[in-house]
Amino acid sequence: SSAASDVYKRQIIAVRPLKDGVIADFSATRMLMQTFIEKTIQKSIFSKPRVIIAIPCGITDVEERAVEGVGYKAGTKDVYLIEEVMVAAIGAGLKVDRPEGVMIVDIGGGTSEMAVLSLGGIVVENSIKIAGNRLDLDIIEYVKKKFNVIIGEGEAEEVKKQIGAATLSMAEEKMNVKGRSLATGLPEVIVLTTADVKDAMQDSLIKIVNSIKQTLEETPPELAADVMEKGIYISGGCAQIKNLDRFISAETGIPVFIAEDPTNC
């Protein structure tokens, strides 16, 4: 989506079918889902596929019905909804069916989802609309204020991936970034450091941590003790931000582990 957002000069209008974890454009979402179905399931005139769609916790009944509606409009026979945190936990290999507490934090593009699970169900869950997209905007705003230069969402995302970090380590990285000077209107290249990106993302990362803390505070004591012992598991694209596990661990006092394949959980 970030690459698509940067093609405005070609007279192409880029849209985000989903925003903050919910449907923003019904028609575009339907076409997107149809494309996924066509790529993964062989077409048949005799049968329609059954699909399972992961949804954020905390969405409204109206938003749930909108998701189901898109699923049926895309040509499916049955649509089943499941919470993203449950899918992420299973994908991360957590034993969610056992009589003990496990905690998953899924930091995606539009939302960060966190939950404590036990006996195959969700005991406590929270969701905030601060995740990868928000971090990209944080970087854009930081560059605008510090350098008086505007950069695109694609550049901001690449900066986050390449040199972004939640805490500083011994080796600080640098990256040349192309943008447009707000003073002259001309192209300009600036140099961003890991420290710049850390500072840009800090406030949003703190908000994610505060939501994790809130989830733990709402967790029954015996399950919270399990989480304290076994740790918190992180999934989603933003789980790959350098030192994010150390940052969350330092703020919560709990061991933090990154899922083996966080982007595909």
What are these regions (language model features)?
Residues 1-107, 116-232, 239-265:
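Nucleotide/phosphate-binding catalytic cleft detector across ATP-hydrolyzing
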